[in-house]
Amino acid sequence: MFKNQPKGLYVLALANTGERFGYYTMLAIFLLFLQAKFGFDSAVSGQIYAGFLALVYFMPMIGGWLADKWSFSKCVVTGVIVMFIGYLVMALPTGIRSTGSLAILLGALALISIGTGLFKGNLQVMVGDLYNDPKYSSMRDSAFSIFYMAINIGAMFAPMTATAMTNIAMGAQDLVYNGQLPSLCNQYLDSIQAGAANAEIGAQITAIASEAGMLVSDVTDFATNYIETLSTGYSYGFGV
């Protein structure tokens, strides 16, 4: 597949695989993370998700402009570093349902979008530049096929990796993921903050948890621990 291709293609394709793996791992769990950790409904979560994607697709315009004034390679390297910092910040477990944690998250998303803008389009230009040499010009189309295949390889393993990291974190606390529990736990904690625990929701949490083999001795403690553990698992997924 790489036979007779310039050696730089190996490096650029591998970088593309790694970047897309991290990006799609994050996207696979991002909405669930927002809803679990902060108790956002689907509308608010969707707005944050859409805003992030808008930045991701807008920033390459800035990245291309900077590359013309700086250089493609410097933009790519800087983009990798900025993205790494952004993912590292997202991987750090912070308090659930707090304004401070949300501010940290939004800062991390800004870093990731900026890094992606510096990295993504400029990496493709670097691939194309490898084939300006007449020796390799006839292989340009096959090179980009390999390059885009690298995207799919990274994306293919992302969802299962995110799920595995979440399950590891949950299993360490003898918890099991259930799609209903994050919302119910947040609703119950909201009712506590409002001054009166919602007994009906508490009963639902207890029933679902018991059916899954989880022990609930105190609903408030269980709900808090469940959200904290699930959020930590998602954070681990961001750091992969």
Where are the model-predicted features located?
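Hydrophobic core of transmembrane alpha-helices in multi-pass small-molecule transporters
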Residues: 17, 86, 100-122
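Glycine-rich segments within core transmembrane alpha-helices of 12-TM secondary carriers
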Residues: 56, 141-167, 213-216, 240
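Symmetry-related core transmembrane helices of the 12-TM Major Facilitator Superfamily/SLC fold
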Residues: 106, 178-186, 231-240
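Cytoplasmic membrane-interface "Motif A"-like loop-to-helix N-cap segments
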Residues: 68-83, 138
